[in-house]
């Protein structure tokens, strides 16, 4: 049963209402103008860190293979565009904003104080790039009847349905498009979101948003050290090497031999899961049991019975699971068989801490994000293996969705989604 049906979500009427509101907002907006200023952006990082930047143009979007930055935000939107031409206007506008924000520059001045400011001002007079990446993905719903794109939908893209341990909230699921915004500092991420919303009042409406972070040592290592999640375990140890281009072609990127629509080449399937942790319950669980559930030493990250984090577990010599339990997380997620090689994926998860639930429990957990060339062979296959794992007692997926990360922008004459919309 599809998620929207269970929760009675009426998407078309909601979009019409939001589009009317967006049109009113657009009437009060003003064109962008750039002015030269030398004021520095605030922040605790050194100027060198603030000036770090990722290339915007290329075969693939940044933010997928990019070493994880410290701060992250996931924002899903409903698209309010009325037709395909309107959708093209949206994608061109997003491309322009991403290009400016990720490369940095002087904040625009507002020549007429009776009009709204052209920039939020939260970064000061100069918008430093701050290692910002903004990755645009499209959801299953963008390929409905509105824009005539159904024949071009990626073959494995689908609506997220419930797994046995899920407790999905309709307000935290799906979206026509998804932005993954990452940077060295949270204020840069927030500034980027506000800039994008300001420029698209008649084209986008926020559906849901979650902000995340990774442990400081991992962010400063630029991908060399594994983040630690809020259960206290290293998260992403078994990730494939993102610096290995040949391996990434096999694991992450859609290629010409997959019988996918031609426009998808260079893109990637993205699975997003908002996973709530029962941290109070976990913190009262004995260390030995925690390690048995994960199959790893909590301090070193090494597979049980081994010494180092990146040691490869030897399941063949432990067929009964006496060292690493048969239902441990690492053993189910990656059994290390010839068959499981096809289900590799690149994880890019972040922790979140939101406040307190209605029941008085800490609301914190994991923003799970992974990329793969085939959603069914990747995330869906792995998640089916994990159904019933011992860790389920401590975690509860509450939202997310499946998306397709668009191929990159070739140059200044190109725009995100151009190959899709020109078909």
Swiss-Prot record:
Subcellular location: Periplasm
Post-translational modifications: Predicted to be exported by the Tat system. The position of the signal peptide cleavage has not been experimentally proven.
Enzymatic reactions: heme b + 2 H(+) = protoporphyrin IX + Fe(2+)
GO molecular function: ferrochelatase activity; heme binding; metal ion binding; peroxidase activity
Cofactor: heme b
Keywords, comma-separated and alphabetical: Heme, Iron, Lyase, Metal-binding, Oxidoreductase, Periplasm, Peroxidase, Signal
InterPro entries (alphabetical): Dimeric_a/b-barrel, Dyp_perox_C, Dyp_perox_N, Dyp_peroxidase, EfeB/EfeN, TAT_signal
Bound cofactor: record note: Binds 1 heme b (iron(II)-protoporphyrin IX) group non-covalently per subunit.
Record-listed E.C. numbers: 4.98.1.1, 1.11.1.-
GO CC annotation: cytosol; periplasmic space
Induction statement: Expressed in response to iron deprivation at pH 7.
Binding residues annotated for heme b, in chain numbering: 236-238, 329, 334-336, 347
Record's signal peptide: 1-35
GO biological process: iron import into cell
Summary of the function given for this chain in its UniProt record: Involved in the recovery of exogenous heme iron. Extracts iron from heme while preserving the protoporphyrin ring intact.
Family per record: Belongs to the DyP-type peroxidase family. EfeB subfamily.
Record's subunit section: Homodimer. Part of a ferrous iron transporter composed of EfeU, EfeO and EfeB.
Protein name: Deferrochelatase
Organism expressing this protein natively: Escherichia coli O6:H1 (strain CFT073 / ATCC 700928 / UPEC)
Gene from which this protein is expressed: efeB
